[in-house]
């Protein structure tokens, strides 16, 4: 029979995360659940967390900071960031091990909000301005692909367009169900640049700073929770993006 035991280093990782979850995260669950976001809170500040279970609650900022520091001290924070950026370079099996343990609590250990789609595809200037600060937790981003008419087939049905105008691109369209969009420092927006090629080379990703002229957000309520979620419509009304942010 094949050996199904985890490698020794992953067993150690599993134990480390389990101890943090049991001793730091689970004891905060009651406080988290008893403090839903305020009704007029549309931006999703750092003190609000949304879990995959659709349960939304809040904790004081200092408690999130405490969990984040534990995550950084143990190396969990950048566990899957490539080694060349100072991370652990952990693979898929390690990801599974971590997810299994982290999701034992609805209060989850913070990890680096690294935009993986930028790794090995951004320019040196973009790396310095956006990627590395994101890895360090200094910037947050939101990935904008899904649209009202383009969910399961974004390549074929995407309506957001980007038109070249001199040294800029002009983006027009609407994205939907975008997590954390309003509070993000920048957005990674997919838009059609060649309607004939589309997913075969005609869809481009743009870095859109938040705020930008013509960029706006509308919060979306999710039926599984009575509180306001961190899901948003992202409206792009002739938002100009320089070629340097493609």
Predicted regions and their residues:
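Amphipathic, small/basic residue-rich leader segments at the start of a protein or domain
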Residues: 1-110, 129, 133
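A short core secondary-structure module
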Residues: 168, 172-220
